[in-house]
């Protein structure tokens, strides 16, 4: 253990933690795009079904990811305080909670699968609904494995091991692409082939991450999984952190769906331009999001060690790093936008509109995005999750959703209204979270017993 005259993390240790997370986020996004492109070759009914069901999948994945992060915060703080015993106890409860919740969710949705699809999507073409039912069935089977992987990967990152989750994720993504090629093109299984391939890759992730948690060379080692029993005090702490974060992530997805329904009324040119802009905007933010995920581990361990000044220092340090990364990413994506729209075969009108929106994003995103997202990652690691949830939900519905709908439907703005709303959301969040950060009230939470 370092003495108090040294920083808890040196630059080499930060790179070792952050780079694998960034690579994992980037490759997962690129592989997801490739996966969608492969499924699109099956036909319009297939791609429509996958797109519809994926909107549910993303909602579930984000909620489970937030819950597992709640447990990882406990683990990282206990490890920071050199309390390996309670870190291991917390890790076991994270796995327990994630298995119970994901299995219950999967079972509920399996029982009410058809009514759920009809309620959520309403009247769609028969072929689309048939394909949706097939794809949704296999997606539901994968929920427990998503929960297990999210829990295991979060536990690994909490002990500064981000390399193993990256390797698992990369291998599983290539497995998914290979499985699609065999089952969709080789065996002609269509949507069912895509769903089975995804299920197999998720089972692989869960099995490998659970196996790797048995490594007794790591601070957290879990061996006898079937002997895990509920510890209600720890479960309560996990849920107190995880549930607000889960609600926050879920609300973002609902907001996206509301915006998507508004854009869908603007015509095919706007829809195509907005779809490509979404992909490119997501791409230029991935590296900074990876830094934010790593920041949660760093701040958690600092606070566990009782070094609040270090937590403040690293939030500032990694926010500056994120700003540099965002500027570089925005400029790179801006330079690649025209070649990408040409390779994608977009219509000239859609390509022109996409380039206009990316130009706007390149200008405004470096101004406020980092302050609106990166410090909150660190403050959540301190247990400041309710403030983050309330702020994020309010600014999203007030600015991102309401302003977008108002500008589109009242003033006749095109899809640029989405990004005006987004920028106003980022700016308001940045102001509120900056005030919160400098108030130091986020440091008053007690996630673990000292």
Region spans (language model):
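Short runs within selected transmembrane alpha-helices of multi-pass transporters and secretion channels
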Residues: 68, 138-157, 165-173, 194-209, ...
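Short alpha-helical transmembrane segments in multi-pass integral membrane proteins
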Residues: 1-21, 75-142, 186-243, 299-365, ...
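Small-residue-rich hydrophobic transmembrane alpha-helices
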Residues: 47-107, 146-165, 271-337, 369-393
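Transmembrane alpha-helix boundary and packing residues in multipass membrane permease domains
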Residues: 21, 25, 36-37, 73, ...
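Residue-level hotspots within the lipid-embedded alpha helices of multi-pass solute transporters
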Residues: 25-29, 62, 102, 106, ...
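N-terminal transmembrane alpha-helices
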Residues: 6-37, 41-42, 58-70, 74, ...
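Transmembrane helical elements of multi-pass membrane transporters/channels
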Residues: 16-35, 138, 172, 201-205, ...
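Helix-terminus/linker motif at the lipid-water interface of multi-pass membrane proteins
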Residues: 26, 30-48, 117-126, 182-189, ...
């Amino acid at each position: 253990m370092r003495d108090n005259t040294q920083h808890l993390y040196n630059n080499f240790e930060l790179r070792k933690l952050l780079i694998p997370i960034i690579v994992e986020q980037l490759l997962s996004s690129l592989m997801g795009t490739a996966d969608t492109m492969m499924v699109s070759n099956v036909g319009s009914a297939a791609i429509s079904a996958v797109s519809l069901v994926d909107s549910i999948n993303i909602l579930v994945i984000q909620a489970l990811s937030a819950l597992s992060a709640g447990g990882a915060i406990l683990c990282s703080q206990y490890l920071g305080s050199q309390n390996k015993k309670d870190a291991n106890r917390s890790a076991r409860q994270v796995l327990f909670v994630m298995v119970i919740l994901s299995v219950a969710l999967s079972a509920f949705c399996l029982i009410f699968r058809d009514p759920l699809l009809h309620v959520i999507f309403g009247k769609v073409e028969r072929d689309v609904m048939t394909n949706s039912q097939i794809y949704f069935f296999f997606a539901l089977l994968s929920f427990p494995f998503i929960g297990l992987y999210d829990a295991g990967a979060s536990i690994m990152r909490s002990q500064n091991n981000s390399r193993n989750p990256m390797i698992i994720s990369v291998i599983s993504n290539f497995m998914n692409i290979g499985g699609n090629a065999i089952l969709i093109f080789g065996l002609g299984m269509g949507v069912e082939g895509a769903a089975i391939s995804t299920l197999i890759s998720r089972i692989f992730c869960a099995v490998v991450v659970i196996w790797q948690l048995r490594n007794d060379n790591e601070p957290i080692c879990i061996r006898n999984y079937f002997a895990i029993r509920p510890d209600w005090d720890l479960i309560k702490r996990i849920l107190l952190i995880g549930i607000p974060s889960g609600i926050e992530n879920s609300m973002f997805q609902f907001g996206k769906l509301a915006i998507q329904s508004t854009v869908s009324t603007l015509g095919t040119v706007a829809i195509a331009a907005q779809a490509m802009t979404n992909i490119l905007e997501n791409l230029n933010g991935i590296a900074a999001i990876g830094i934010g995920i790593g920041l949660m581990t760093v701040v958690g361990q600092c606070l566990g060690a009782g070094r609040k000044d270090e937590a403040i220092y690293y939030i500032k340090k990694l926010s500056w790093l994120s700003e540099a990364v965002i500027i570089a990413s925005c400029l790179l994506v801006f330079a690649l936008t025209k070649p990408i729209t040409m390779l994608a075969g977009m219509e000239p009108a859609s390509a022109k509109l996409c380039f206009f929106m990316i130009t706007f994003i390149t200008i405004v995103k470096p101004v406020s995005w980092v302050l609106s997202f990166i410090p909150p990652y660190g403050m959540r690691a301190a247990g400041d999750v309710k403030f983050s949830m309330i702020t994020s939900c309010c600014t999203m519905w007030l600015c991102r959703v309401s302003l977008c709908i108002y500008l589109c439907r009242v003033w006749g703005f095109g899809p640029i209204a989405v990004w005006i709303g987004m920028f106003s959301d980022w700016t308001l969040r940045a102001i509120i979270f900056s005030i919160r950060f400098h108030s130091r009230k986020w440091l008053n939470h007690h996630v673990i017993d000292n």
